């Protein structure tokens, strides 16, 4: 899904691809960032030193993700399951991403559940849950 406008985010392409597949038909935009409202709120329900628990706005999210490729490169996303909520604005997606931590050379395999609220075909709220232990182990475990 990479184009020159989003070349700095190429390390996240498998994430973008699996998420956009899960939100197909519910959001507008060819790229993940195009599907996000300018004032969207992102909540991260896990704690890592230096990582925020909440981000407000698409530009702030892009700034947060801009250096992702310095630490992690994803090579695939899979295991997508899409759940529809009683609230028609809410889509719940389960998915996995796989890649490698650059600092350790360790495999990075993680599972996510994202609760996504959509209004006017744009993401306005994103609540993210993941396997924190998998991320911590990939980052701090013995080098591959």
Task: Enumerate the language-model features and the residues they cover.
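Residue-level detector of alpha-helix boundaries and kinks
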Residues: 4, 17, 46-49, 101
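A beta-strand edge to alpha-helix "cap/lid" segment located at domain peripheries
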Residues: 2-6, 66-144
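A solvent-exposed, acidic/Ser-Thr-rich amphipathic alpha-helical stretch
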Residues: 9, 30-89
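Intrinsic disorder/low-complexity signal
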Residues: 12, 16, 29, 38, ...
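Short, solvent-exposed loop/turn segments that connect beta-strands within catalytic domains
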Residues: 24-26, 48-49, 89, 103-105
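Short, low-complexity N-terminal intrinsically disordered segments enriched in polar/charged residues
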Residues: 1-35, 140-144
